[in-house]
Amino acid sequence: MTFERIEIFFSYSHKDESFREQLETHLSMLKRQGLIKFWHDRMITAGDEWKGQIDKNLNTAHIVLLLITANFLASDYCYDIEMKRAMERHELGEACVIPIILTPVEGWMYSPFAKLQVLPKDGKPVTKWNDRDDAFVSVAQGIRRSIELIIGSQTNSNDTTLKQMQENEPFKSVKVIEEVAPDEWFKSKQSRIHNFFRSLFDDK
């Protein structure tokens, strides 16, 4: 089974950097498993065009995490640029957008992302949990479930593509030869036969 590592984009206010770092820590097992890779603007290297890098990664991420605080809602760039672009990709089915409520915020339920399922569980802000680690575990578990769904859809898509390839005439013809040719003769000619039929297929 093969799948593409899930790209996660962090959309957050720099004033909330400590929250982002804590969340990254709680997602470290997913990273160790090779399931995800992170991107946030602190990864932009000296000399890079920061806006171009943000746009590039925001437009390719499988999952966009919105780290919701009053700082996030007050940031024109977070709200008007990153969040709105993330929601556009969500509407097109290109990305999964997950709002994470970090602190109590007045009015977030009137925002475009209010229609989405938020984390932690029941939308209780991370800072309102008795144990903050419990809150981040709840968030990480929710993100893991989303990742598993995306990987499942990737696997199903790959299986469908393979099936479609196998149903093409060149592959059917090779299958017929495999069934009727003596084992030793076929083994000696297998590579040439496959290449011959692949060349026919590629020319179509």
Enumerate the predicted regions with their spans.
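Defense-system signaling and execution modules centered on TIR/cGAS-STING-like, death/scaffold domains
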Residues: 1-11, 33, 52-60, 119-120, ...
